[in-house]
Amino acid sequence: MDIYPRYQTKEIKATKSASNELWHFKKDLWDVLEILEQGYPCSSSKRKSNIIENCIKKGNKIHKAVVANCGNYWLVIHFGIFSYKKRRF
């Protein structure tokens, strides 16, 4: 039995600060897996080639997960939730 969810056959783990962010928003690594599988790329800036930044829209909120490929596992380095507002021009 695996205690960590898997994405592309690699376990998903979290840094201490990302773990605190997940806890603050009452989310866990299974929510990160959902964002990675069903979300869309939403990188707002240039990232290293081994880093994935995916988002998923839930209601009027955007859930963002930033994970790094560390070879044998994925490491969550940031998790955040922010509001979504349509811009009017």
Where are these predicted regions, by residue range?
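Ribonuclease/tRNase effector modules and their secretory precursors
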Residues: M1-F89
